[in-house]
Design a protein with these regions (language model features):
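Single-stranded nucleic acid-binding surfaces, predominantly the OB-fold ssDNA-binding core
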Residues: 1-116
Length: 116
């Protein structure tokens, strides 16, 4: 099975940086994707051990994120709930054309490799 996603959009909530007990870092950010038709959709993104710039993402920043889709379950208020999110493996400001091209090429390579 293949689980590859690429999202291009605008940061709609400032990045939240979390220091994990293991010493790692986690950034949570929401990216809003606007289609030419239909309503905008907001995608939650979690990025483990991201580059330093990811923790400074502000509302309005245009980004490209590649990774995988994950649905996780947790208990809140005594009720089991779930959240579907993108777990980022790579990301870049949209303005960095070279980085964006590398991210897209890597995603294409993964998809082509799965087709072989």
């Amino acid at each position: 099975m293949l689980n590859v996603v690429v999202v291009q959009g605008v940061v709609s909530r400032p990045a939240q940086l979390v220091e994990l007990p293991s010493g790692g870092r986690l950034v949570h950010v929401e990216v809003t994707v606007r289609q030419s038709e239909g309503p905008a959709e907001t995608v939650p993104v979690s990025w483990f051990d991201p580059p330093a710039w990811a923790g400074d993402l502000q509302v309005g920043a245009e980004v490209v994120v590649a990774g995988r889709v994950r649905r996780r379950f947790f208990r809140a208020g005594g009720v089991t709930q779930s959240r579907t999110e993108v777990v980022a493996a790579k990301g870049s400001p949209l303005s960095s054309q070279r980085s964006v091209a590398a991210i897209l090429q890597e995603a294409v390579s993964v998809i082509e490799g799965a087709a072989d």
